[in-house]
């Protein structure tokens, strides 16, 4: 089993791990010849987070070898990984490799620091990890969801977080509603009161014809644009997701009525050469 690579895009990798650090303690890091997966499947909630990146998005001189079709699965403590990446911010070169010490697998991040007076200096952070068997990870599947009934860009997450923080004290369920006319609403219904906050003038992203066979028959196109789709969500799930407000550049929310709220969280700018996206699957609740 062998893994070694240079980090070519430290900024994007650091932002990705920073976002994950706000969600859970450990992530499943799946290293494959063409792609790198970061996955969080919390045991205590029904929300899952998946990110699939092409290798060249963050790495170069990439080598991964194993007896399992050159796939390596690791359980990585996110906080330790994030701290190591953050410390490498101004390094001239950074590499990551899988190593072992006293039978403990390690993810070793080595950073090179160049100075005029004393030449180069190399600092290595060793992060204890757990190697996951293929049989263990084979039962973890990315959720599937039907085509969305509504898709909309969310407003700035800081604004949403402010509202959700207030509403969670009123109820453990928050209703998120949206339509194809650029409207989004958060509301709480309790016996003593009904409170809501509405945003207007948001953008509904266009569907990609290469991804949708017949756009005219897509669920988001067959209902009236002003008709709302309602999702009843756990307030804790929303609070957990909104912790990434400091690193998210833009978020597309896909409302799959009766199934799940799927959120595509972009942590890179549209003009960036490579795109890094986190996909959240948040289960909905039926009254």
From Swiss-Prot:
Localization terms from the record: Cytoplasm; Nucleus, Nucleolus; Cytoplasm, Cytoskeleton, Microtubule organizing center, Spindle pole body
Keyword Ion transport: no
Gene deletion effect: Cells have a nucleus that is cleaved by the septum or the septum divides the cell into a nucleate and anucleate compartment.
Residue intervals passing through the bilayer: none
Protein family membership: Belongs to the HUS1 family.
Assembly description: Interacts with mug40.
Protein's recorded name: Checkpoint protein hus1
Designated gene of the protein: hus1
């Amino acid at each position: 089993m062998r893994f070694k690579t240079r980090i070519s895009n430290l900024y994007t990798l650091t932002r990705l791990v920073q976002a994950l650090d706000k969600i859970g303690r450990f992530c499943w890091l799946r290293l494959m010849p063409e792609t790198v997966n970061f996955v969080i499947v919390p045991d205590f909630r029904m929300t899952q987070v998946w990110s699939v990146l092409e290798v060249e998005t963050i790495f170069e001189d990439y080598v991964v070898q194993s007896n399992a079709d050159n796939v390596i699965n690791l359980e990585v403590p996110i906080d330790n990984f994030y701290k190591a990446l953050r410390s490498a911010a101004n390094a001239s070169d950074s590499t990551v490799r899988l190593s072992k010490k006293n039978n403990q697998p390690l993810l070793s991040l080595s950073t090179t620091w160049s100075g005029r007076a004393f030449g180069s200096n190399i600092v290595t952070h060793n992060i204890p990890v757990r190697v996951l068997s293929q049989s263990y990870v084979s039962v973890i599947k990315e959720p599937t969801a039907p085509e969305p009934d509504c898709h909309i860009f969310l407003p700035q997450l800081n604004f949403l977080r402010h509202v959700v923080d207030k509403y969670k004290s009123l109820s453990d369920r928050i209703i998120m509603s949206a339509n194809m006319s650029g409207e989004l609403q958060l509301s709480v219904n309790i016996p003593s009161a009904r409170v809501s906050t509405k945003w207007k003038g948001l953008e509904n992203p266009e569907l990609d014809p290469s991804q949708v066979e017949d756009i005219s028959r897509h669920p988001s196109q067959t209902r009236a644009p002003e008709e709302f789709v309602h999702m009843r969500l756990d307030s804790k799930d929303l609070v957990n997701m909104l912790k990434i407000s400091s690193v998210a550049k833009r978020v597309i929310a896909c409302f799959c009525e009766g199934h799940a709220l799927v959120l595509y969280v972009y942590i890179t700018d549209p003009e960036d050469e490579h795109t890094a996206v986190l996909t959240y699957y948040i289960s909905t609740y039926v009254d």
